[in-house]
C-alpha cells in the first residue's frame, strides 16, 4: 500500500483516471454497437446518422488519448465501408 502522501495521491489519481478511461471506452463501444445495429436493420439513413455520432465520440476519445489514432481510423473505415455497401 502507498505509504507516502505523494504515493497516496498518485494512487488516488490513477483510480480516478482508470474509471474515467473505462467510461469513455464503454461509451465508444456503445456508439459503435448502435452503428452496427443500424446497419443490420438495413436503414441507411439511420446508419449514417449513427455513424456520424460515433465518429464524433471516437474522435474525441482519440484526442484525449484513450484510443490509438490508427484504431479509430480502422473503426471509421470499416463502418463507412459497410454503410456504402448498403447503397449499392
Swiss-Prot record:
GO molecular function term, any single one: small ribosomal subunit rRNA binding
Region (Disordered): 1-23, 69-88
Superkingdom to which the source organism belongs: Bacteria
Biased composition (Basic residues): 69-81
Key words, A-Z: Ribonucleoprotein, Ribosomal protein, RNA-binding, rRNA-binding
Keyword rRNA-binding attributed: yes
Any single Pfam family the record assigns to this protein: Ribosomal_S20p
InterPro entries per the UniProt record, alphabetical: Ribosomal_bS20 (IPR002583), Ribosomal_bS20_sf (IPR036510)
Function: Binds directly to 16S ribosomal RNA.
Family annotation (HAMAP family): Ribosomal_bS20
Assigned protein family: Belongs to the bacterial ribosomal protein bS20 family.
Listed name of the protein: Small ribosomal subunit protein bS20
Lineage: Bacteria, Pseudomonadati, Pseudomonadota, Gammaproteobacteria, Oceanospirillales
Amino acid at each position: 500500500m502507498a505509504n507516502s502522501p505523494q504515493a497516496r495521491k498518485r494512487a488516488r489519481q490513477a483510480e480516478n483516471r482508470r474509471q474515467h478511461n473505462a467510461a469513455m471506452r464503454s461509451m465508444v463501444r456503445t456508439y459503435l454497437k448502435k452503428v452496427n445495429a443500424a446497419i443490420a436493420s438495413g436503414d441507411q439513413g439511420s446508419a449514417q446518422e449513427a455513424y456520424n455520432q460515433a465518429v464524433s465520440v471516437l474522435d474525441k476519445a482519440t484526442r484525449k488519448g484513450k484510443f490509438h489514432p490508427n484504431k479509430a481510423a480502422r473503426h471509421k473505415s470499416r463502418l463507412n465501408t459497410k454503410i456504402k455497401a448498403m447503397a449499392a
